Amino acid sequence: IYAALMGGFASLLWLGSCSSFISVMVFGGHLKPIGLYGILGYIWVAPAAIIGLYIGAELMLPEKKKFIVIIYSILSIIFELLLFVDFLFFDPMKSIEFETSGSSIDSNFVYGHPIFILIVIFLVSVLLLNGIGSIHKAIQSTGIVRKKFGLMSLFFIIFVLVAALDSLLTPGPILFIIRMGMVVCAFLVYFALKP
């Protein structure tokens, strides 16, 4: 159930993109204010990270699971506060760069901003705890369990890679390949969790 929740929250990271697309199609223009695009997409980082890192802690450090979840919950609260405070009281363009071209919006975190640093911490942690943790469990297991942990490790590694590239690169042909990587991730997690 935790992996399904994590996957659900991770898929909501594209809610800003989808909402903007629908806004352009229905109303003929982008979401207003533009910072709403970032809020709708990035509000889901914290719950996805907490649940994902709970799974990773269970795989790698079950005896320290509670401590890890508390630490990442605190970091997630800080992330959410920074996201909303920036949106409500300041200029969201200081933490997230928005580039509009025609009917699409691209958003990237501003390098060095605390929100960017927290995203990097979350992604590296998921890679280490979940990606390496799944590889570790796959090595310890046999048969179908080994295969499922192998698929989970591929999912986490590819997800971190394409999520990082998606937020770093500007739109272009390579973005299609990155988004297809997300589609591959959906299939990997499905087959890893399928009974």
Task: List PLM regions with ranges.
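Aromatic-anchored segments of alpha-helical transmembrane domains
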Residues: A10-L15, S76-D86, F155-A164
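Extracellular-loop-to-transmembrane junctions of the mid-late helices
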Residues: L81-N130, G172-L175
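Short juxtamembrane and helix-loop transition motifs at transmembrane-helix boundaries
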Residues: G29-G38, Y111-F116, I139-R146
